[in-house]
UniProtKB/Swiss-Prot annotation:
Lineage of the species this protein comes from: Bacteria, Pseudomonadati, Pseudomonadota, Gammaproteobacteria, Aeromonadales
NCBIfam families given in the database record: lolA (TIGR00547)
Keywords assigned: Chaperone, Periplasm, Protein transport, Signal, Transport
CDD domains per UniProt: LolA
Function per UniProt: Participates in the translocation of lipoproteins from the inner membrane to the outer membrane. Only forms a complex with a lipoprotein if the residue after the N-terminal Cys is not an aspartate (The Asp acts as a targeting signal to indicate that the lipoprotein should stay in the inner membrane).
UniProt entry tagged with the keyword Thylakoid: no
Any Gene Ontology CC annotation: outer membrane-bounded periplasmic space
Keyword check for Iron-sulfur: no
Gene field: lolA
Subunit architecture: Monomer.
Name of this protein: Outer-membrane lipoprotein carrier protein
Chief location of this protein within or outside the cell: periplasm
InterPro entries registered for this protein in UniProt: LolA/LolB/LppX, OM_lipoprot_carrier_LolA-like, OM_lipoprot_carrier_LolA_Pbac
Length: 202
């Protein structure tokens, strides 16, 4: 019995160390890409692997907590995080929803890419296989079950995958990755267009 307990303890310590090393490695890689722009292609699948939808657009991220997510096809939409609030704009219905950043990211580990707050990491387990990192939520009630980030040989983010708790998942493939995009200064500022309804949930 003592031998079994000892083996169990060793395995637990070893697995904890592996998690810590994987998390530290991922944190460092993300810190090294604190500013980047890219084009994204998204494919959404149901729990059985059937393709549901494709989308594409442009992504701009500046850590901490600033990003501009512009979907251009098949329908246009825009998500802007200014470091404090998140603005979700749907031009088709002429409505924008304003959320507190902490509320908007509650159910998505995407904040780990855009943010740098260590307190978020305690809610996730991290495993690593080469340049692929899988971030799994410890909270079984969250909408997002896991989040996978893949880096290329230049340590640029080449892809990330999001799996929902109910089995549906999305693949995001990044291209035209640029660590030195030229910023005009207003990329992370959202101004409500004239005639657009505001749904303020802050």
């Amino acid at each position: 019995m003592k031998k079994q307990l000892l083996i169990g303890s060793v395995l637990l310590v070893a697995s904890s160390q592996v998690w810590a090393d994987a998390a530290s490695s991922l944190k460092q890689k993300l810190a090294d890409v604190s500013l980047f722009s890219a084009k994204f292609a998204q494919t959404v699948y149901d729990s059985k692997g059937k393709e549901l939808q494709k989308a594409g657009g442009d992504l701009l991220v500046q850590r901490p907590n600033r990003f501009n997510w512009h979907t251009t096809s098949p329908d246009e939409s825009l998500i802007v995080a200014d470091g404090k609030d998140v603005w979700v704009y749907d031009p088709f219905v002429e409505q924008v929803t304003a959320l507190k950043l902490k509320d908007a990211v509650l159910n998505t580990p995407f904040i780990l890419i855009a943010g740098n707050d260590d307190k978020f990491w305690k809610h996730y387990d991290v495993t690593q296989e080469g340049n692929v990192y899988t971030v799994t939520s410890r909270n079984k009630d969250e909408l997002i079950a896991s989040f996978r980030v893949t880096f290329d040989r230049q340590n640029n983010i080449s892809r990330f995958d999001v799996k929902e708790a109910q089995g549906q998942w999305s693949e995001f493939t990044l291209s035209s990755f640029n660590r030195k995009p030229v910023l005009k200064g207003n990329e992370f500022v959202f101004k409500i267009p004239k005639g657009v309804e505001l749904d303020d949930q802050r």
